[in-house]
Amino acid sequence: MDRVVLLLSVLSLGVSSQPITDSQHLFSIAVSRIQNLHLLAQRLFSNFESTLQTEDQRQLNKIFLQDFCNSDYIISPIDKHETQRSSVLKLLSISYRLVESWEFSSRFLSGGSALRNQISPRLSELKTGIQLLITANQDGAEMFSDVSALQLAPYGNFYQSLGGEELLRRNYELLACFKKDMHKVETYLTVAKCRLSPEANCTL
């Protein structure tokens, strides 16, 4: 709880007009948070994969590559070039929606309850931080639309009692999509932070 209060008190500085160094500091906090979440996602995925037979891993990976994540409905840059051309506000907007899309879904992740229980509060922290960064970076030329305008429905089989191969596939899909989305958010926030430094090389 203390960590959340500290984050909010620090990030709230961004709501007022501050020098570029303050904005960079706020972004540094957000980037640190998403790096931690991405690491947790990788560990959960690795833990789950370690319980599978080699052939099961191969088949599930093949299926996943042909399937879609729920968050694919969120319009985002298609490659690194488009990412680099996107505005800071756009990257923050997409990051917010990606994080928000996992607030409910993350409760169903496999791979270890000790790690999974860390994810929900950290997603909430990051979501709050990104919202404050969005407010700090809005101007008359580019206004951010309501972040709650797009609400993704949960995965279709969340409420179904699954077993065997279907349960295995759902668990693999959730973990793979979560890892993929946390990587996206880490990339977008890192580029957005870099864009505030005119002398920096933001090449991906």
Swiss-Prot record:
Disulfide bridges in this chain: 69-177, 194-202
Highest rank taxon of the organism: Eukaryota
Keywords, ordered alphabetically: Disulfide bond, Hormone, Pyrrolidone carboxylic acid, Secreted, Signal
Places the protein is found: Secreted
One cellular component (GO) term of this entry: extracellular space
Tagged with keyword Signal: yes
Residues where Pyrrolidone carboxylic acid is found: 18
GO molecular function, one term: growth hormone activity
Keyword Disulfide bond: yes
Signal peptide per UniProt: 1-17
Name of the protein: Somatotropin
Phylogenetic classification of the source organism: Eukaryota, Metazoa, Chordata, Craniata, Vertebrata
Gene: gh
